[in-house]
Swiss-Prot record:
Protein name from the UniProt record: Kinesin heavy chain isoform 5A
UniProt keyword Nucleotide-binding present: yes
Native species: Mus musculus
Gene behind this protein: Kif5a
Major subcellular location class: cytoplasm
InterPro entries reported for this sequence: Kinesin-like_fam (IPR027640), Kinesin_motor_CS (IPR019821), Kinesin_motor_dom (IPR001752), Kinesin_motor_dom_sf (IPR036961), P-loop_NTPase (IPR027417)
Length: 1027
């Protein structure tokens, strides 16, 4: 429903581009002369527009001057259009699009996309927005969908309000500026462009980017809608300048033809005298019918070349803009009343109807009094506006109050007059009865008509409710499809991640097997070393036994020697006493000599004992060093003990053997020293200090050799221990890594399991909401039946009231006294009755005509009622089919999900992928995930962007001279890449051209439904294409 109409002119703005390189090399002159902000002089003639932009104007200045306000208008419920017109290579595409991802060179379309969401985020949080976009081109006078290249020849239809729209065009729901730019990138890749002598990226079609915004206040349920058409027209071409030939020439013919049709439409609207405007001459003018003279606020850019080479084309473009400036549009807010507003309006009309019925009843009562011959006083008459109908009736039934002349007549004539009066009274009563019957019939027909209207209103409400339910179910169905697609994508990515993890696990298993093999080799080496050590220990045991036997023999010899020395020392005199005195003296001398020798030997033994003490002290130092080494060995053994107990036992045995070996070595050295002393004593029996020193040196050398062998053995053992410890550390690190990876995989599996449970809970919640919706529908149906019964009761009471009033009027007419006046009074009564009869006859005829008209209208109303009932049945059938389709899809998706779940349980768990795009509402006060200073986020640099390099070079110079604005800094992180010059003809195709968008507004209607029926059935999907 539209209201708040206001008339406005088309806003026309003129923009001149800089001279390009070819024009500079050719020596073309710069012909425009700018005067102020709204006028330009070409060839001495001034041209005035709403705004004129010189070549050094930046994209931001152009946007703030013309397009920023139209965003607010569209969000306020108006329709808007911005389109660029001009010669080829005049900068139209640069003005409308520019470089999409360059914050300084982006055009009107990407800036509008950013500004729409900035406004929405700052609005009331009770508002909810649904934004959908379409992108199509008019190529060779055929409408081609740029978001689905399979749709190459779409048709233009009209909705129930006779507003043109493109039927079957793909519509995408968006919720962020990035999504709008993605749609533009996708459409631009499919648009027709070519290379001409005047432009490297010449548009070969008219492109139209449509933004449809619907907003609803959640609290008041008030709904507004607005459409914004962003049109980039192809430029008019002169073949002699562009050098077009072949397919490019055919494109130029169609472009010039459609632009000529646009010029004819603007000329007809500018003159204002022609009753026919040729909108249907071109599909472009047909689509833009509302933008040119209709319900829209339109802004037109006329882009011009400043070169003297294009003087004629520039003047023609300026004249076109001046004609367009005189066109008047009537813009109105697209407001849809809520149920509460409809109810208030219905109550207001009901009160008005009630007041009118009361006035009619009073006027009928007053009229009946006048008809009965009563003179109603002015105090009892209806006054003011309420008595307008009674005054009209009174004017038609004047009362004759002329002279009172008394005339005497004969009794026969008197009787004749009385009979005539009775006859007339009888006719009057018959007419009154007939009038009452007709009035009752009229009331019945009016009541039936009111009932039909109420039924029609209720049917319309039910129809709208069913349509809303159907659209809601369709949106839920789309959301369910998106969710299932999301789950399928996540599960597919999960399967891929599982395969990757399986490969990694296999690699780790191979590495672990290699390490196990290496460890087995080390263990085998260690076992061989242990067997070698055991063999050496056995050899050492044999050697120790042999040394023990030698030492025992030496001990026995030493004891015998000591015994012999002792006995000889004691028994020698006894033996000598029985011999000769001389021999005794010799023996005594010999004994004394032996004593002295023994003394020297004892002295030497004492020296040797001192030397032995010193050796014991050195051995204790060595023992302490050995103890520290043994402590270090025990520490390493404690580390090795965690790996194997067997290694500890081996090391412990090794340590005991080393200690036994050291003690035996010390004992052997001591015994060898005593043996040496004994041999020296037996051989020489003379003091030999030099031999003692040699024995001492031999002992020290032997001790040093033992010490070096012991240190070498300790160093070898330390090296082996270090190698084993390093191997143990490496195995521990590998085991820890494998354990961490296993824990990570288990955590991912638990997370996916939780997500699956959440999805199941959400599905149960949706099922519960659907059941509650069905219950509410049944309750509403019962309430409607109750209201219908109450209305029937009121209707019956009204009939009884009308019959009672009619009866009372008849009784009051019968109770009136008969007039017994004279002949004059009788003549007056006769005249009065004749006039009344004539008036009643007229009223009767009028009532008969009204009755006939009502009878004629009754079949039409019944037909409309039947059509409404059939439409309601069709809607119910469509709703039922949609529910059945949704249930089938749900079962099929559930089966697919169960199958994939089984496959995932069979394999393993993975990571969840990114979500698919969902058509969701935009709520003010909730900013997107991207930073406010970087609303476009990180975008792919491969997006195709066609722009005029002249504007880029010229504005780069201008921007170097002037500081960048806040808006340019606002998008400092965005980027764009330009495309190299194309070949002579380029036609970009979409990779997934055969894919159908899930938000496509095509619906599977039954056969025979035309555009109007579709618009009534699906008002949310078939919106007006007004700009």
């Amino acid at each position: 429903m539209a209201e708040t109409n206001n008339e406005c002119s088309i806003k026309v703005l003129c923009r001149f581009r800089p001279l390009n390189q070819a024009e500079i090399l050719r020596g073309d002159k710069f012909i425009p002369i700018f005067q102020g902000d709204d006028s330009v002089i070409i060839g001495g003639k001034p041209y005035v527009f709403d705004r004129v932009f010189p070549p050094n104007t930046t994209q931001e200045q152009v946007y703030h001057a013309c397009a920023m306000q139209i965003v607010k208008d569209v969000l306020a419920g108006y329709n808007g259009t911005i389109f660029a017109y001009g010669q080829t290579s005049s900068g139209k595409t640069h003005t409308m699009e520019g470089k999409l991802h360059d914050p300084q060179l982006m055009g009107i379309i990407p800036r509008i996309a950013r500004d729409i969401f900035n406004h929405i985020y700052s609005m009331d949080e009770n508002l909810e927005f649904h934004i959908k976009v379409s992108y199509f081109e008019i190529y060779l006078d055929k409408i081609r969908d740029l978001l689905d290249v399979t749709k190459t020849n779409l048709s233009v239809h009209e909705d129930k309000n006779r507003v043109p729209f493109v039927k079957g065009c793909t519509e995408r729901f968006v919720s962020s500026p990035e999504e709008i730019l993605d749609v533009i990138d996708e459409g631009k890749s499919n648009r027709h462009v070519a290379v001409t002598n005047m432009n490297e990226h010449s548009s070969r079609s008219h492109s139209i980017f449509l933004i449809n915004i619907k907003q609803e206040n959640v609290e008041t349920e008030q709904k507004l809608s607005g459409k914004l058409y962003l049109v980039d027209l192809a430029g008019s071409e002169k073949v002699s300048k562009t050098g077009a030939e072949g397919a490019v020439l055919d494109e130029a013919k169609n472009i010039n033809k459609s632009l000529s049709a646009l010029g004819n439409v603007i000329s007809a609207l500018a003159e204002g005298t022609k009753s026919y405007v040729p909108y249907r001459d071109s599909k472009m003018t047909r689509i833009l019918q509302d933008s040119l003279g209709g319900n829209c606020r339109t802004t037109m850019f006329i882009c011009c070349s400043p070169s003297s080479y294009n003087d004629a084309e520039t003047k023609s473009t300026l004249m076109f803009g001046q004609r367009a400036k005189t066109i008047k549009n009537t813009a109105s807010v697209n407001l849809e009343l809520t149920a509460e507003q409809w109810k208030k309006k219905y109550e207001k009309e009901k009160e008005k109807t009630k007041a009118q019925k009361e006035t009619i009843a009073k006027l009928e009562a007053e009229l009946s009094r006048w008809r009965n011959g009563e003179n109603v006083p002015e105090t009892e008459r209806l006054a003011g506006e309420d008595s307008a109908l009674g005054a009209e009736l009174c004017e038609e039934t004047p009362v004759n109050d002329n002279s009172s002349i008394v005339v005497r007549i004969a009794p026969e004539e008197r009787q004749k007059y009385e009979e005539e009066i009775r006859r007339l009274y009888k006719q009057l009563d018959d007419k009154d009865d007939e009038i009452n019957q007709q009035s009752q019939l009229i009331e019945k027909l009016k009541q039936q008509m009111l009932d039909q209207e109420e039924l029609l209103v209720s049917t319309r409400g039910d129809n709208e409710k069913v349509q809303r339910e159907l659209s809601h179910l369709q949106s839920e169905n789309d959301a369910a499809k998106d969710e299932v697609k999301e789950v399928l994508q996540a599960l597919e990515e999960l399967a891929v991640n599982y395969d990757q993890k399986s490969q990694e696990v296999e690699e780790k298993s191979q590495q672990n097997q290699l390490l196990v093999d290496e460890l087995s080799q080390k263990v085998a080496t260690m076992l061989s070393l242990e067997s070698e050590l055991q063999r050496l220990q056995e050899v050492s045991g044999h050697q120790r036994k042999r040394i023990a036997e030698v030492l025992n023999g030496l001990m026995r010899d030493l004891s015998e020697f000591s015994v012999i020395v002792g006995n000889g020392e004691i028994k020698l005199p006894v033996e000598i006493s029985g011999a000769i005195e001389e021999e005794f003296t010799v023996a005594r001398l010999y004994i004394s000599k032996i004593k002295s020798e023994v003394k020297s030997v004892v002295k030497r033994c004492r020296q040797l004992e001192n030397l032995q003490v010193e050796c014991h002290r050195k051995m204790e130092v060595t023992g302490r060093e050995l103890s520290s080494c043994q402590l270090l060995i025990s520490q390493h053994e404690a580390k090795i003990r965690s790996l194997t107990e067997y290694m500890q036992t081996v090391e412990l045995k090794k340590r005991h053997l080393e200690e036994s070996y050291d003690s035996l070595s010390d004992e052997l050295a001591r015994l060898q020293a005593h043996e040496t002393v004994h041999e020296v004593a037996l051989k020489d029996k003379e003091p030999d200090t030099q031999d003692a020193e040699e024995v001492k040196k031999a002992l020290e050398l032997q001790m040093e050799n033992h010490r070096e062998a012991h240190h070498r053995q300790l160093a070898r053992l330390r090296d082996e221990i270090n190698e084993k410890q390093k191997t143990i550390d490496e195995l521990k690190d590998l085991n820890q890594k494998l354990q961490l990876e296993l824990e990570k995989l288990q955590a991912d599996y638990e997370r996916l399991k939780n997500e699956e449970n959440e999805k199941s809970a959400k599905l149960q919640e949706l099922t519960f909401l659907y059941e509650r919706h069905e219950q509410s529908k049944q309750d509403l149906k019962g309430l409607e039946e109750t209201v219908a019964r109450e209305l029937q009761t009121l209707h019956n009471l009204r009939k009884l009231f009308v019959q009672d009033v009619t009866t009372r009027v008849k009784k009051s007419a019968e109770m009136e006294p008969e007039d017994s006046g004279g002949i004059h009074s009788q003549k007056q009564k006769i005249s009065f009755l004749e006039n009344n009869l004539e008036q009643l006859t007229k009223v009767h005829k009028q009532l008969v005509r009204d009755n006939a008209d009502l009878r004629c209208e009754l079949p039409k109303l019944e037909k409309r009622l039947r059509a409404t009932a059939e439409r309601v049945k069709a809607l119910e059938g469509a709703l039922k089919e949609a529910k059945e389709g949704a249930m089938k899809d749900k079962r099929r998706y559930q089966q697919e999900v169960d199958r994939i779940k089984e496959a995932v349980r069979y394999k393993s768990s993975g990571k969840r992928g990114h979500s698919a795009q969902i058509a969701k509402p935009v709520r003010p006060g909730h900013y997107p995930a991207s930073s406010p200073t970087n609303p476009y986020g990180t975008r792919s640099p491969e997006c195709i962007s066609y722009t005029n390099n002249l504007f880029q070079n010229y504005q780069n110079l201008h921007l170097q001279a002037a500081p960048s604005s806040t808006s340019d800094m606002y998008f400092a992180s965005s980027g764009a890449t330009s495309v190299a010059p194309l070949a002579s003809y380029q036609k970009a195709n979409m990779d997934n051209g055969n894919a159908t968008d899930i938000n496509d507004n095509r619906s599977d209607l039954p056969c025979g439904y035309e555009a109007e029926d579709q618009a009534k059935l699906f008002p949310l999907h078939q919106e007006t294409a007004a700009s």
